[in-house]
């Protein structure tokens, strides 16, 4: 089965509104065809509405970096999936290691978010990944499989087929370290095998799996050549228009 690549930037808590607007203006007319690749930027929630307006008519898709699992209520400071979808946003990133570590999000929280996002009409980008300690102990497969099983609990086969899963080894995020292409592919293969165990081969061959962790324009091509890697979730290299476009160059 042919899976369309998805290259997604994750800005985290960076940029001002004027910088975000300038970025969209710089990239929107220079992206490869969406027939070849999905080009996505994950931006702080404050910027999504003006970015969505500016990207009209272009190939650029947008992602929220988080959402809550309720659509309304007394949840001060949170953003609902329904409100995000109402802006025309296609994707919502959930389960990032920074959310798990700093905001104490659990697998159960992330699973609730996945269900709420699908119900609202967006697509989750579900993150998983292990610490350096887990990696060095040889327990990566066990750890990542556990995160996937918990994150997908109760989702339908159709939902999982449309899901994006991002494998990001925590020890390679923003550290300058990167997993070798072989390690990245092997662990993305673990993710795919876990999906197959839960939902069958057809679903596992449909789900798209990204690698994230210090991905750069000079390293992305080797990663994308691997069997189980269908895209990248990119932090630092997505912050500047030139480097984001360089990540997509092979698809032009």
Curated annotation (Swiss-Prot):
Pathway: Carbohydrate biosynthesis; gluconeogenesis; Carbohydrate degradation; glycolysis; D-glyceraldehyde 3-phosphate from glycerone phosphate: step 1/1. It catalyses: D-glyceraldehyde 3-phosphate = dihydroxyacetone phosphate. It is an enzyme of class 5 (isomerase). GO terms for cellular component: cytosol. Its main location: cytoplasm. It is found in: Cytoplasm. GO terms for biological process: gluconeogenesis; glyceraldehyde-3-phosphate biosynthetic process; glycerol catabolic process; glycolytic process. The active site is at residues 96, 168. Belongs to the triosephosphate isomerase family. This is Triosephosphate isomerase. The lineage of its organism: Bacteria, Bacillati, Bacillota, Bacilli, Lactobacillales.
